[in-house]
Amino acid sequence: MKEKLLLIVIPALMAGCNQEKEKKSDTPAETAGLSLPQGFSAMIVGEDLGHTRHMEVAANGDIYASLAQEKNGGGVVCLRDSTGDGKADRVEYFGDFTGTGIGLYNGYLYFGADTVIVRYKLSPGQLIPEPSWEVIAGGFEETHQHSTKPFSFDGNGQIYVTVGAPANACQEQDRTKGSKGMDPCPLLERFGGIWRFSADKLNQDQMKDGYRYATGIRNAVATHWNKKEGKLYALQHGRDQLNQFYPDLYTEEQSNELPAEEFLLVEDGSDFGWPYCYYDQIQQKKVLAPEYGGDGRETGRCEAKDDPILAFPGHIGPNDLLFYTGDMFPEKYRNGAFIAFHGSWNRTEQKGYNVVFVPFEGKIPAGDWEVFADGFAGSDSIANAGDAKYRPCGLAQGPDGALYICDDEKGTIWKITYRKS
């Protein structure tokens, strides 16, 4: 289902450039050390919480964050502010699984471990859910790459689960110079896409009960169902190592920027082309991957694949997506998209480590993207990902319209608020 939505978006977006036109706040005490647009402030809700990945904020303000590694005997950290000062004074850990996906739905806390989606019953007034859990979906194979299971609810009883591909480009020998791509790629049967399940049915199996909603997505850690438009969106982590494996086709500079991190409007039946294709934001087109005979310019079979609605520079790690529906922030942010970029590891100039904003009109971007929250890395220039002080990973919206950001480096959660001058 080829849709040339990308062509509607202004060219500046495709080049991955942005213009920070808003004046930034210059009062570190009011922004908890972050750089934010004028009028916004930040406070630290909790810190040293563990490797916090994604999070949800309940209607009463309680926060639930998934953990990549167990801490204090649990894979979920629960926070409550009982004094009203904005800071969590109660922090509890629970859960038998670690992972990334987390969500609140119909009185349950859902959790995405690497091989199973489970849910815990919430009790009114209680911070910690019931300890027993039920399996919603399982049968996911255990892998050593892109094993996380982030998910989104559509509000109509369905849950959409990312099943990342355990490979770079589906080569006969993964991440090996000279190894050809498998054609057809056998991984696509149960990986490299988004599967849909019933959000309420128990003990579903990926291959028996799941529905492959979209394919050709290498790994989408950031997904969100846009309730206003009734559409699923995702951001893909693009493939790696073009220059390392194909130095005759790609310079180091090209490999730094390519391929794009793709912002996807995911429809039923979408095919975004991985592993056969990638999106080149400089040429503004899908390009045939070198493992499948591409030369960095040829489109070939990729002409039939779906394009992104927006393309970001390569290797900056989009790890969460949130469409803002609150009333606290100025009107320009209403129904626009916030994206948390985890930061790069495989480029000579490290980029990302920030949260950006994309304005929307209807189902597509309506203008240039801009950096919304910055300063997480702790320095304007870092040599590698390990030097970053914080790495943004999760986003959530509070009942008052505040934006929450968590990092998985030091386990810090920030609350971003806005007050008219």
Locate the predicted segments by residue.
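Beta-strand-rich domains and repeat architectures in extracellular enzymes and scaffolds
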Residues: M43-A68, G317-F323, I339-A340
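C-terminal motif of bacterial Sec signal peptides marking the signal peptidase cleavage site
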Residues: M14-G16
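Conserved beta-propeller blade signature
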Residues: D62-S66, Y108-F111, Q158-T162, K231-L235, ...
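Asp-box/WD-like beta-propeller blade repeats and closely related beta-sheet repeat scaffolds
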Residues: R90, G99, Y105, T115-D154, ...
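Residue-level detector of Asp-centered blade-edge/turn motifs that repeat once per structural unit
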Residues: V57-G61, L104-N106, F153-N156, H224-E229, ...
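Blade-level signature of beta-propeller repeat domains, shared across WD40, Kelch, NHL, RCC1
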Residues: A396-S421
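Surface loop/turn motifs at the tips and blade-to-blade linkers of beta-strand repeat domains
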Residues: V45-L49, E92-F97, I136-T143, Y211-G216, ...
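Beta-propeller domain segments
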Residues: E22-Q38, T148, A165-K208, G216-N219, ...
